[in-house]
Amino acid sequence: MNELYRVIEKKIKASGYPRAISGEAVYDDICDQIDGKENGMYILMSKFEKDVVFEYHITILDDDFNLGLLTMRTPEGVFETNFDR
């Protein structure tokens, strides 16, 4: 899992996101957001920090999920990363 967390952090930092980020915290937030949801495609919004909103574009499968796009809305600006690339 540590490698997955590092990949998440790397992709977010590459978007120009100006704040400290934990790949594990993002992964845990996604898991909390999708808990109990049916298979399908979703756009989920999460107040990741007091003044930061993360918008996840996720496809939920039987035993897994795919995070396509992540948009991070902060006072510093809007940052986006595509996890499918």
Question: PLM features: what roles do these ranges have?
Answer:
Residues M1-N2, F83-R85:
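Short intrinsically disordered terminal tails
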